[in-house]
């Protein structure tokens, strides 16, 4: 709703609307190239975490999600759900329903995805789709919390391999979750 549209509505219905801006649902939009390169002081911590991951898991690999490996992501998501108390938290449970259905319907939804392996096992994955010619949106990103550096590396690798043709990446909102907000603001 633009300012002009709001003013027009107000002129037709004086005092009937209250406009608020819910901070919890603001999207985080970044220049893709900056999140691929992670150059400069601002990204020093991210690079350190990535380097720690690479040192701890020298056999690590990145793969595009395909029909042949999407089931492994599904199984990883089930383990992630169990480890993160999703059954007890209605919001987390809903989020996991979306994640699991997105993996089940990966092809039908025309999603792009990437995964990280360490020790031959999937330790992180991400899913998204283009929303216009210059912007790609990341809907889902999961990694095991005890695998240090998995989150920044899946983000960086996915963008490098699948999203580099888009000027911007929208990493969606933080839903008011402080940990997620801190992570997204750190980029």
Language-model features, listed with the residues they occupy:
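Well-ordered, non-membrane alpha-helical segments in soluble/globular domains
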Residues: 1, 46, 96-99
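A short amphipathic beta-strand at an alpha->beta junction
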Residues: 1-7, 167-170
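Conserved active-site alpha-helix within GNAT-family acetyltransferase domains
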Residues: 6-21, 48, 175-187
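Alpha-helix C-terminal capping segments
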Residues: 13, 53, 103-106, 158-163
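Acyltransferase donor/substrate-recognition loop-hinge adjacent to the catalytic core
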Residues: 13-87
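Short, conserved active-site entrance elements at the starts or edges of catalytic domains
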Residues: 68-122
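Aromatic (often tryptophan-rich) hydrophobic motifs at membrane interfaces
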Residues: 111-187
């Amino acid at each position: 709703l633009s300012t002009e549209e709001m003013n027009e509505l107000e002129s037709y219905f004086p005092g009937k609307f209250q406009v608020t801006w819910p901070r919890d649902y603001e999207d985080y939009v970044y220049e893709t190239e900056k999140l691929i390169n992670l150059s400069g002081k601002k990204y020093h911590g991210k690079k350190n975490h990535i380097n720690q991951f690479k040192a701890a898991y020298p056999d690590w690999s990145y793969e595009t999600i395909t029909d042949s490996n999407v089931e492994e992501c599904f199984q990883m998501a089930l383990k992630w759900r169990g480890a993160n108390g999703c059954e007890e938290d209605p919001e987390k449970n809903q989020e996991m329903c979306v994640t699991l259905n997105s993996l089940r319907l990966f092809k039908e939804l025309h999603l792009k995805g990437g995964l990280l392996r360490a020790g031959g096992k999937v330790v992180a994955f991400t899913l998204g789709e283009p929303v216009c010619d210059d912007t790609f949106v990341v809907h889902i990103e999961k990694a095991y919390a005890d695998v240090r550096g998995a989150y920044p590396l899946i983000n960086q690798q996915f963008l490098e391999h699948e999203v580099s043709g888009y000027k911007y990446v929208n990493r969606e909102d933080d839903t008011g979750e402080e940990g997620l907000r801190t992570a997204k603001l750190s980029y």
